[in-house]
Amino acid sequence: YWIGPIGLAENESEGTDFHAVKNGYVSITPIQTDMTAYHSMTALQQWLDKE
């Protein structure tokens, strides 16, 4: 899964993800994307409380 552009050849220096992939390795980067709509939490809680 990619979040952004693949990158250019100048980014393939040793120690980078691109270098690892180019040399047949798997590169795993732990990423956490928080897409919670915090601005909607109060309205959602009020809606749930009505149930």
UniProtKB/Swiss-Prot annotation:
Free-text comment on the cofactor: Binds 1 divalent metal cation per subunit.
Enzyme Commission code(s) on record: 3.1.3.5
GO CC annotations, alphabetized: cytoplasm
Originating species: Histophilus somni (Haemophilus somnus)
UniProt keyword Metal-binding, yes or no: yes
TM stretches of this protein: none
Record's keyword annotation contains Transmembrane: no
GO MF entry, a single one: 5'-nucleotidase activity
Record-stated family: Belongs to the SurE nucleotidase family.
Keyword terms: Cytoplasm, Hydrolase, Metal-binding, Nucleotide-binding
Cofactor (UniProt): a divalent metal cation
Location in or out of the cell: Cytoplasm
Annotated catalysed reactions: a ribonucleoside 5'-phosphate + H2O = a ribonucleoside + phosphate
Name of the featured protein: 5'-nucleotidase SurE
Function: Nucleotidase that shows phosphatase activity on nucleoside 5'-monophosphates.
